[in-house]
Amino acid sequence: MQGIESDYSPDLLRGNTDVLLLSLIDELGSTYGYQLIKEIEKRSQGFFRFKEGTIYPALRKLENEGLIRGEWQELPSGQGRRYYWITQEGKETLTKKIAIWQSFTTAVNLIFKPNEV
């Protein structure tokens, strides 16, 4: 499948990385940073290509806010990996942020395509 054209301003995504991460962590259950990077890229058909320098600070922020919890687990190879799970507070925050996002996109669509909404 061919990717979506990704000529967009990062400003459009600013402030919404958290909701993308919360949504995926909620759906996937136990997951880790690199898996989230790949899943976002796959689901967006390559539109969003996050770097580790974006994802890991965002995950730490979510963890510090109590919206997710993280735990180091040792792999059979002996290496460690930090897995993340969403908390109840994270689920509640996700529900609110999705509602806000849906209202926002509806309002934008009223401007872009007033006869189609």
Task: Label every model-predicted segment.
Residues 11-54:
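N-terminal helix-turn-helix DNA-binding core of bacterial DNA-binding proteins
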Residues 63-80, 85:
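Beta-hairpin "wing" of winged helix-turn-helix
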Residues 40, 44, 72-74, 88-90:
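Short, well-ordered turn and helix-capping elements at secondary-structure junctions
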Residues 1-15:
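Intrinsically disordered, low-complexity serine/threonine- and proline-rich regulatory segments
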Residues 89-117:
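Amphipathic alpha-helical dimerization/coiled-coil segments
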Residues 55-62:
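Basic amphipathic alpha-helical segments that dock to polyanions
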